[in-house]
């Protein structure tokens, strides 16, 4: 469970970007964060990952102040996929890209192989595991980023504009895989998006931000 309680935040001496934020996300939810550029969506997700800390209020993970949690513990629980897939891609094979995180944790080779193959299968990339990422389509690179996060067995995935720049088929592929891991594996999905059609068809809940404030919290149908 992730929760922001009466959170306020501003970058350095700038204008506040999160104002009086109360937002609770339960385990296993599929939630979309909506809002125009600068509305606070990405900042809220960064607060949930302890990449920045509130000026006032609390951010909680499983009821505990996130500031008290060890970074490695948070990294195990929350995976983040950047808007630009090239930020997460090195020059190894697809398999090695996904194995990077588990290897950094010094897991056994047997465990690494199992977790990587499960992640590749979950995102429809098994047949591409020996390819090089630079040869993949943009949509495949995006799925590779998700697979790399999945290989660490997170409880929550935060996905920043995960369908941006993809054609209709790539969007459907991406969202069908995300729906499956949410429903079959119980992984919480937090989808940062501008795409109302995607949100309407896949998210179970929508949270709308405007100038750093929550202005709507309900089902996409209600929105």
Please describe what each predicted stretch is.
Residues 34-36:
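The feature captures the beta-strand-to-loop junction immediately N-terminal to the Walker
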Residues 193-194:
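H-loop/switch region of ABC-family ATPase nucleotide-binding domains
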């Amino acid at each position: 469970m992730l929760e922001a309680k009466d959170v306020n935040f501003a970058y350095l001496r700038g204008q506040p970007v999160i104002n009086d934020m109360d937002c609770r996300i339960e385990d296993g939810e599929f939630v979309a964060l909506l809002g125009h550029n600068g509305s606070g969506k990405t900042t809220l997700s960064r607060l949930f990952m302890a990449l920045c800390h509130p000026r006032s209020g609390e951010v909680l993970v499983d009821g505990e102040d996130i500031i008290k949690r060890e970074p490695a513990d948070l990294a195990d629980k929350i995976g983040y996929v950047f808007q630009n897939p090239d930020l997460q891609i090195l020059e190894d094979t697809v398999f090695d890209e996904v194995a990077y995180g588990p290897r950094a944790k010094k897991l056994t080779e047997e465990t690494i192989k199992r977790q990587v193959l499960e992640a590749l299968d979950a995102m429809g990339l098994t047949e591409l595991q020996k390819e090089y990422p630079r040869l993949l389509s943009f949509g495949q690179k995006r799925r590779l980023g998700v697979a790399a996060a999945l290989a660490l067995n997170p409880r929550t995935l935060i996905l920043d504009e995960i369908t941006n720049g993809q054609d209709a088929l790539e969007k459907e592929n991406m969202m069908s895989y995300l729906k499956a891991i949410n429903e079959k594996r119980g992984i919480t999905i937090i989808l940062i998006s501008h795409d109302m059609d995607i949100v309407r068809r896949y998210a179970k809940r929508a949270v709308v931000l405007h100038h750093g404030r929550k202005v709507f919290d309900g089902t996409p149908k209600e929105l």
